UniProtKB/Swiss-Prot annotation:
Single GO BP term: translation
Record's keyword annotation contains Ribonucleoprotein: yes
Annotated spans, Disordered: 141-164
Protein family (similarity comment): Belongs to the universal ribosomal protein uL3 family.
Gene3D superfamilies, alphabetized: 3.30.160.810, Translation factors
Disulfide pattern: none
GO MF annotations in UniProt: rRNA binding; structural constituent of ribosome
Lineage of the species this protein comes from: Bacteria, Bacillati, Bacillota, Clostridia, Eubacteriales
Protein name, per record: Large ribosomal subunit protein uL3
PROSITE patterns from the UniProt entry: RIBOSOMAL_L3
InterPro entries per record: Ribosomal_uL3, Ribosomal_uL3_bac/org-type, Ribosomal_uL3_CS, Transl_B-barrel_sf
Length: 209
């Protein structure tokens, strides 16, 4: 059964497994999320639920969104996301989705926006080799050849060049849920997940599981 939840990355720590080995984990505050809208194949053409997470001041929400929340009679939420499901009959508008929908040992996909690195050169951005560092060398970290001269008289599209690095939507696939703490709405994911601390993440069933 498909399922998903929204959360906030709190940071990383480590726990011990049954064998006494240290396991690095990412702590995610997962929910509680509120169902804002329910979509059905009869009306919208597909089955899905729209959920919200996190508090937000009223002055930061525009009028159309305020009306959308008012229609479902739910509080204003900072993050809104839609999850497509095979069956939405078990969900009602206003219902809460909590961290206990997942269990330890399950495989999930975690999506977020990766850390921004700013403007970077080809060495850091693409792993290019640097030039000679010895006396007489005219280039060290500069870009090498970028294309032909008179033919083709241009630089090809998609050439790996310096530029903005990071701050892109990123998903890590098939990672394991190490532990769930339902009373605190925490999910511990084995390893790292995209984004800085306090960033918004989406946790869904693994597509590869």
């Amino acid at each position: 059964m498909k399922k998903g939840i929204l959360g906030k990355k709190l940071g990383m720590t480590q726990i011990f497994n049954e064998e006494g080995k240290v396991v690095p984990v990412t702590v995610i505050e997962a929910g509680p999320c509120v169902v804002i809208q329910k979509k059905t194949s009869e009306k919208e053409g597909y089955d899905a639920i729209q959920v919200g997470f996190g508090t937000i001041r009223e002055k930061l929400v525009n009028k159309p969104l305020k009306g959308h929340f008012a229609k479902g009679n739910v509080e204003l939420k900072r993050f809104v996301k839609e999850f497509r499901l095979e069956d939405t009959s078990s969900y009602e508008v206003g219902a809460e989705i909590k961290a206990d929908i997942f269990a330890a040992g399950e495989k999930v996909d975690v999506s977020g926006v990766s850390k921004g690195k700013g403007f970077q050169g080809t060495i850091r951005r693409w792993g290019a080799h640097r030039g000679p560092m010895s006396h007489g060398s005219k280039f060290h970290r500069a870009v090498g050849s970028m294309g032909g001269s008179s033919d083709p008289s241009r630089t090809f599209k998609s050439k790996k060049m310096p530029g903005h690095m990071g701050h892109v939507n990123t998903t890590v696939l098939n990672v394991e849920v190490a532990k769930v703490i339902p009373e605190k709405n925490l999910i511990l994911i084995k390893g790292g997940v995209p984004g800085p601390n306090k960033s918004f993440v989406v946790i869904k069933n693994s597509v590869k599981a």
